């Protein structure tokens, strides 16, 4: 976990708490073993860490899912987690970046809904206008 001091004014500082995660691989099976229960335990632990440590920003740096076309159950687990932690932590912001196991377009598809929950997703690298 990274604690980053940010100077707002010369005499006023705040601390921003950033929690960086990656490689969740929701929906993964390991040699035929379904890891759904493990993923649920992890997400519950993560939600509790966010609450207890008053995290300001959660970064999910790729491989949210194990495959580019995840099951409905895996997607449901993902969206329920985002809804839960943003509802329980009104100042939390989430940034998600697609990894090589993720479908960038699939992660970005519900962007307007995710933005309503203070969540930004970047899956596709876009070229700047004029350059």
Identify the meaning behind each predicted range.
Residues 3-82, 90-91:
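N-terminal active-site segment of His-dependent metallophosphoesterases
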Residues 31, 64-82, 98-117, 123:
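Metal-dependent catalytic neighborhoods of phosphoester/phosphodiester hydrolases
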């Amino acid at each position: 976990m990274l604690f980053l001091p940010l100077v707002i004014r010369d005499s006023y500082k705040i601390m921003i708490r950033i929690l960086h995660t990656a490689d969740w691989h929701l929906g993964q099976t390991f040699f035929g073993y379904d890891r759904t229960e493990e993923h649920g335990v992890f997400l519950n632990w993560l939600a509790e860490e966010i609450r207890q440590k008053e995290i300001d920003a959660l970064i999910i740096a790729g491989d949210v899912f194990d495959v580019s076309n995840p099951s409905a159950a895996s997607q449901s687990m993902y969206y329920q987690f985002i809804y839960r932690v943003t509802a329980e932590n009104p100042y939390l912001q989430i940034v998600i970046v697609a990894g090589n196991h993720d479908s960038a377009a699939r992660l970005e598809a519900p962007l307007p809904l995710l933005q309503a929950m203070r969540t930004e997703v970047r899956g596709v690298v876009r070229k700047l206008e004029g350059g």
